[in-house]
Amino acid sequence: MKRDRLGRFLSPGSSRQCGASDGGGGVSRTRGRPSLSGGPRVDGATARRAWGPVGSCGDAGEDGADEAGAGRALAMGHCRLCHGKFSSRSLRSISERAPGASMERPSAEERVLVRDFQRLLGVAVRQDPTLSPFVCKSCHAQFYQCHSLLKSFLQRVNASPAGRRKPCAKVGAQPPTGAEEGACLVDLITSSPQCLHGLVGWVHGHAASCGALPHLQRTLSSEYCGVIQVVWGCDQGHDYTMDTSSSCKAFLLDSALAVKWPWDKETAPRLPQHRGWNPGDAPQTSQGRGTGTPVGAETKTLPSTDVAQPPSDSDAVGPRSGFPPQPSLPLCRAPGQLGEKQLPSSTSDDRVKDEFSDLSEGDVLSEDENDKKQNAQSSDESFEPYPERKVSGKKSESKEAKKSEEPRIRKKPGPKPGWKKKLRCEREELPTIYKCPYQGCTAVYRGADGMKKHIKEHHEEVRERPCPHPGCNKVFMIDRYLQRHVKLIHTEVRNYICDECGQTFKQRKHLLVHQMRHSGAKPLQCEVCGFQCRQRASLKYHMTKHKAETELDFACDQCGRRFEKAHNLNVHMSMVHPLTQTQDKALPLEAEPPPGPPSPSVTTEGQAVKPEPT
């Protein structure tokens, strides 16, 4: 006997007859062992995994033509899910029964990967000849493991432990059929505020355009992953599928959207146009979360309604079911028309549910919100219904906390506030005195800058600076004194203006004294009699009146007024008694006393006479 590349026995006429390849494949599964019936047995699974039709000898798979000849089977293939390359022994067909299913008695409830994949994920598997019709053993086992787990979870998540169905007491009892299972699960149908809100919204939108009264038409069975759906509609053909388990379907939608299914634009023109609208036609367009009516699902139709039945398996896996899921709520449609009103999108379903539940559970939610506000900063992993709002609140709280902590932790660089006062106190306690180093100069300064300026002006740059204006014979030894003289005497620049009367002044101190007249302020006051004045010169002149006459050595011989200094007496005589002073100068020289020793009471050069003390 000859063997092929995989070690399978070939019949003597396999190289010439095309039909013998299947038989040889069947023998290879037994590896030459005789069957129980005594003859060669053809393996059903191997026949179903044939790489082409029975009558086509030269049909090659995706990997190319057969190298060994036209009669040999293709050795390699790709997995539809993981896209890996495997041998024919490691591949399973996507349209065969699940492992462990009975081959002699194929029941109606047997699992097929194409149908189960659409029921679990809501995405139909396209029967495209360009795509591989096989999956590997690993992907096949993982899929059905997840399928059984998710199906059990969906059936238990909204059911109480008391409402579960009791297991069959008899060992040989048959499991309930799909109709009986749907009837048992009718009691487990639960409704949420979101579900009722969507139904009420559809009823109101439907009443605006249609006069027929909607009513319950049928209940879809729980074969579709345990999700029970109720179809409402009117006699005009408008229908609405109420999803009683949106949370579970949202989980399925998220897992389905994780794989980015490309939109096939070529299949859009191939959609049938003559068929009426039915929620079972296209699972992706009839449901709000992209999980449509299962293929072959059993329905319970009320006797007063006339609704089209869901399509067969061949229709479900056709081009119509190849579109990606659409994340939108059910639409109100009529035959040949678009939806009249679209309900809120799935992104706002959770918010609508929360707002709707707040109306009935206000007290409980208020306590929960208070607890959340108190423990907002305790855990970052706690669930919040509005994560986008909570993130912004956490950011603002963290910024405020940082701002409050910054002045306590951070220290500004440089000296601390109040360092100038400390220096002043130290200077007052131990004053530094700078004395002029030049001999005969008694100038004293508290700062080094003042001493340097004094030495420069009075000792180093000492020279005569005459006034440049003609007719002015004044001479200054310091330059800044000369500039001040020129500004005040020889120029008419008045930069200081009174705001009250508009009078102008050359110096700022003159303006300040003038403004005291408008305000009436007299900051200077005599300590003896309380006399008030504005200028220091006025106060000094006033204080001379309070001195005793004995302290004033110089007296006027005309009016008897006394002065402290001889210069003040001369000024008084020249301004008050000018005639008497000129008459004294006009006396003839012969009137002068004869030469002799000068008396102590007479002075030369017209000096004032100082009387002797009596």
UniProtKB/Swiss-Prot annotation:
GO terms for cellular component: chromosome; kinetochore; nucleus. A zinc finger (C2H2-type) spans 434-458, 465-490, 496-518, 524-546, 554-577. Residues 386-408 have a biased composition (Basic and acidic residues). Zn(2+) binds at residues 79, 82, 136, 139. The keyword Transcription regulation applies. It holds the Pfam family zf-C2H2. Residues 591-600 have a biased composition (Pro residues). Keywords: Centromere, Chromosome, DNA-binding, Kinetochore, Metal-binding, Nucleus, Repeat, Transcription, Transcription regulation, Zinc, Zinc-finger. Its main location: nucleus. It is found in: Nucleus; Chromosome, Centromere, Kinetochore. Residues 409-420 have a biased composition (Basic residues). This is Zinc finger protein 276.
